[in-house]
């Protein structure tokens, strides 16, 4: 049962009241109340369940995200730059002299020496701005001794050979990158449809309007952006969040284009087209208008107070997590993400799609599995 149906048919909520919660699931699931299960949103303490007196904790048929939060997960612990610090920690472990420091606290503000990433004869080389365009075995996959990787860089194609290869890009592109994969595996890789998202960062000269209005975040279910918020305070190492409302700040705004009433994967495809066909001017106009209308009573003036805008278009955003409203309950080993991540000769697959979970730890677990498969081959 969807959350919308639950509010309408079980809670008997008024249609106008239900409208207030239509966009509430956007940030986690990329769909509205029509396409997320009531069980999943219960784990997030959405309204409508308090009288049921349900025991806390995850439950069967609950999605990955909901299960994690139901069992105590939280967004509280994160780096101020998101997953960038995790990537930088990995680079420092692989190429120690590329980044100063020794722990997670000092990595945020450390300056990377890009000249040390791709040095001849180094045991680890990271080649930036190099996009893989073809991966294939040198011969039959069952007996080949090498894998050829062709990549594009600076308008030219180059190739390298490797004893093994991990495809860590998102699943849907892999059948085009490696067309020699078995047809069943390629179909499984195409199954999921990543969640399209728009994340906007707006730099303000101060956050006095938030302070004077007594708010740090605003949920706006019928607006172009369903939410806007100041980032949570994160102090780590030499990085400190703003404390004074007279200091500059970044505001995070979220838009998730949906098509209510359709199955989730179809909504994501339509949302992706919406993102790719919308101009920056349209985003900017809506950003300025919504901030003026929301914060104007606190003295905010978009023309005066906005110093920069970054629109992050993420047409292929979060990994797809199976939705009990639309996806079957596959037997163990038969779900698309399990079929899609199967090792093929000297080629393995590892990403968040391979776990059907949009989280860093899930992607790291899949990387560990993929490398172990190749080392044991």
Predicted regions located by residue number:
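Active-site/ligand-binding neighborhood in enzyme catalytic cores
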Residues: 1-130, 141
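Non-transmembrane alpha-helical segments in soluble domains
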Residues: 4-8, 87-91, 95, 178, ...
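Short, solvent-exposed loop/turn and secondary-structure capping segments
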Residues: 34-41, 64-65, 176-180, 213-214, ...
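Conserved aromatic-histidine-acidic binding/catalytic patches
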Residues: 71-82, 86, 157, 165, ...
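Charged, often glycine-rich, active-site loop that binds/positions anionic groups
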Residues: 113-122, 131-150, 313-333
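Mid-domain catalytic core of redox enzymes
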Residues: 120, 124, 128-261
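Conserved flavin/dinucleotide-binding core of flavoenzymes
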Residues: 151, 203, 209-377
């Amino acid at each position: 049962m969807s959350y919308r149906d639950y509010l309408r048919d079980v809670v008997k909520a008024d249609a106008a009241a239900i409208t207030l919660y239509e966009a509430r699931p956007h940030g986690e699931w990329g769909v509205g109340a029509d396409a997320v299960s009531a069980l999943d949103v219960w784990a997030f303490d959405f309204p409508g369940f308090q009288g049921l007196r349900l025991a806390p904790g995850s439950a069967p048929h609950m999605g990955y995200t909901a299960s994690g939060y139901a069992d105590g997960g939280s967004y509280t612990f994160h780096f101020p730059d998101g997953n960038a610090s995790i990537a930088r920690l990995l680079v420092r472990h692989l190429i120690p002299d590329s980044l100063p420091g020794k722990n997670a606290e000092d990595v945020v503000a450390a300056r990377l020496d890009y000249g040390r990433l791709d040095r001849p004869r180094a045991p680890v080389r990271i080649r930036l701005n190099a996009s893989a365009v073809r991966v294939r075995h040198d011969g039959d996959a069952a007996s080949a001794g090498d894998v050829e990787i062709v990549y594009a860089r600076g308008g030219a194609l180059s190739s390298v050979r490797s004893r093994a290869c991990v495809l860590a890009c998102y699943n849907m592109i892999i059948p085009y990158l490696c067309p020699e994969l078995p047809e069943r595996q390629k179909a499984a890789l195409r199954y999921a449809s990543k969640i399209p998202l728009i994340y906007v960062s707006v730099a303000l000269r101060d956050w006095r309007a938030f302070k004077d209005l007594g708010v740090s975040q605003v949920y706006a279910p019928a607006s172009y952006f369903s939410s806007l918020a100041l980032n949570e305070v994160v102090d780590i190492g030499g990085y400190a969040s703003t404390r004074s409302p007279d200091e500059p700040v970044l505001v995070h705004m979220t838009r998730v284009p949906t098509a209510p009433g359709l199955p989730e994967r179809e909504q994501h495809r339509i949302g992706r087209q919406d993102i790719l066909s919308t101009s920056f001017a349209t985003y900017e106009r809506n950003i300025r208008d919504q901030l003026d209308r929301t914060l104007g009573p606190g003295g905010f003036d978009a023309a005066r107070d906005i110093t920069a805008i970054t629109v992050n278009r993420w047409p292929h955003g979060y990994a797809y997590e199976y939705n009990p409203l639309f996806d079957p309950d596959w037997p163990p080993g038969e779900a698309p993400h399990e079929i899609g991540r199967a090792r093929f000769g000297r080629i393995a697959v590892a990403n968040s799609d391979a776990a059907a979970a949009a989280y860093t730890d899930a992607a790291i677990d899949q990387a560990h599995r993929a490398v172990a498969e190749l080392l044991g081959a």
